[in-house]
Amino acid sequence: MLGDRKRKTGHTVLLITLLILSELFAGCGSQEKAGMSELLPTVREENRLVLYTSHKPEVYQPIVEEFENQTGIYVEIRDGGTTELMEDIQNFGKGTVDVMFGGGAESYNAYQHCFDRYESSASAKLNLPIAEEGGVWTPFSELPLVFIYNSRLVEENAAPKGWKQLLGDEKWKGQLAFADPGSSGTSVTILAAIPQILGEDPKICIPAFASQLDGKLCGGSADVVDSVENGTFRVGITLEETAKKRIAQGAPLAVIYPEDGTCIVPDATSIVSGAPHAANAGMFIDFTVSIPVQRLLQDQMYRRSVRRDLNAASPAEMKIVPFDYGWTAQHQDELMQIWADTQKAEREAADAVE
């Protein structure tokens, strides 16, 4: 079954490890894999795929290994943060990278000049409001933004019910976990979603949001859940699948669907312009939206399928605000500049007090 087989590429990596042990451990594991093609002369060029992914191994490994098993295509992987990988594709990816797998759809729109349009063989089965927005990307899963809180530290009736309360109530000042947008694609999505959900000028609501953080930022998206779980912060903003996964592992967390609405933003997959193995890249994208993979997302990964024939019902308390990809792409630089200016002003104010 999908996800149950051992990763055959792991055997190749193990062989390489035995041959060049010190060099491999000096590197970055899967990040080095994308540069190992010269060490694998037995793999024919037409049977390769170079994959960049911002997914965690528990997401990409079962999918990649089953793709390899079914197609005989060897997948070379480099993983990392969405922004880091997008920048690398922009600067060095043409002619060397085939696929970007993972990261919010709005990131693909911001870097759309780096990708080629591809219509999946399953496009007729995908949620049309998402697929029609696609442009250069194909959706992989639907990811609602949610609040989380530490259920040992915050009573249910005291938890923030919506964005206006989270941004306006002084009791959450300095108690809100949020990752640095410079390293977290999820945080970039959140910054873009807040003005759309509240219907406010970004120059007003983003500084108000930043003020609630009180100068405290988490290093990455995973740190948001960690810091709420361990009590460093009492509440946080994250993706539904991230929260549900941790709760299933026994974390003292609870999920809130904001009463004033939330956005469901898909993560995506796309073919890099100039992909050296473009046909294999198309096969991989088709595989990610196939019924077996999409069922795997729902059954084992706490994610929502993008297929109409597999969609699970949303919670009754979830009020969905459409995410405007065009507006986000047009204003992303402005949003990040507002954020940077706000952070600079807060640092200067803190220095003045000292």
Segment roles from a protein language model:
Residues 1-48, 348-354:
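Short, low-complexity disordered leader/linker segments with a strong preference
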Residues 36-41, 49-74, 147:
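Short, polar/charged alpha-helical segment
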Residues 50-61, 80-86, 90, 94-232:
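Extracytoplasmic ligand-binding site segments that recognize negatively charged/polar headgroups
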Residues 106-111, 229-252:
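A ligand-binding cleft/hinge motif common to bilobed small-molecule-binding domains
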Residues 125-128, 143, 174-182, 206-210, 217-218, 287-310, ...:
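Periplasmic-binding protein-like
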Residues 146-153, 195, 265-280, 296-297:
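A bilobed periplasmic-binding-protein/Venus flytrap-type ligand-binding module shared by bacterial periplasmic
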Residues 202, 305-354:
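An extracytoplasmic/periplasmic, membrane-proximal ligand-sensing/linker region
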